[in-house]
Amino acid sequence: MSAIQKRLSNMEVRFDESEVIVIDMGSGFIKAGYSGEDLPRVVIPTIIGERENTQEDNSTQPGDSKPNKVFSKKFGNEAYAHRSDHDLHYPIRRGIVKDWTRMTELLEYVFETELQVNANQATVLMTDCPMSNKDDKHHLAQIMFEHFKVKSFALQNTAVLSMFSNGTTTGLVAESGEGVTYTVPVFEGYALPHAMQTMEVAGQEVTNKMISQL
C-alpha cells in the first residue's frame, strides 16, 4: 500500500465516492462540485450584496404602523452585478473567515441555489486554509453539523490536498490566491505549520497594481 493510500485510509470520515460535495472557500471565490468530476460545478465570487429597504408594518393599530428594515440580498456574481445599488460584503479576508453569519448565508446559497441539494443529505469535504486556527475549525464544523445537519463532514488542509493531487505526500507547496500567499512544507501527508511562511500580497494586489497602470 502506498503512502497516499495509507494516509487516506486513516482519515476519520469515510465517504461514499459518488456523493461527496467538495467546497473550496477562498478570499476571492468559492468553488463547489462533486468529487471525481474534472471541474467544479460552481465558481462564484465570495461576495454578498445587501441593500436596506423600508416597508410599513401594518400589523399594529391604524396610525401606529412603523417602518421595518428589510434587507435585499444577492450572492456571488449577482451581488457583483448589482454593486452600484448594494453594499458589498466579503466574509473571507486574507484566507480567514471574518463574518461567520454571512459566510453561512453564502454556503446556504451554494447548497440550495447553485448545487440544488439538501444539505442535510450531503456528505461534504471542505478545504481548510493553512492559517486557520483550532477555533475556526471547530466553528466551521459546528455550522456544518448543527446548522446544515450534513451527514458527514471532513476538513482538509489545502496544501495536503495539493500534494495528493500530484500523486505525492512530501514536498513544498506554494500557493497564491486572492488575498494571501503562503508556502507550506508537507511531510508524509501532514502539513508542518511551524515552518509555514505567509505574505499578505496576492492576487488582489496584483490586480490593483495593473489597474493603476492603465
Regions inferred by a protein language model and the residue ranges of each:
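C-terminal helix/juxtamembrane-tail motif
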Residues: 2-6, 11-16, 134, 147
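Secondary-structure junction/capping motif
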Residues: 3-9, 42-44, 76, 155-157, ...
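Conserved phosphate-binding loops in N-terminal lobes of ATP-dependent enzymes
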Residues: 19-143, 152, 193-196
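Active-site or ligand-binding cleft "flap/edge" segments
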Residues: 114-115, 147, 164-169, 205, ...
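Glycine-rich phosphate-binding loop plus the immediately following alpha-helix
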Residues: 50-55, 188-214
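Gly/Thr-rich phosphate-binding beta-strand-loop-beta motif of the actin/hexokinase/Hsp70
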Residues: 8-47, 164-193, 210
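Charged, surface-exposed interaction regions in soluble eukaryotic proteins
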Residues: 105, 124-135, 139-180, 186-200
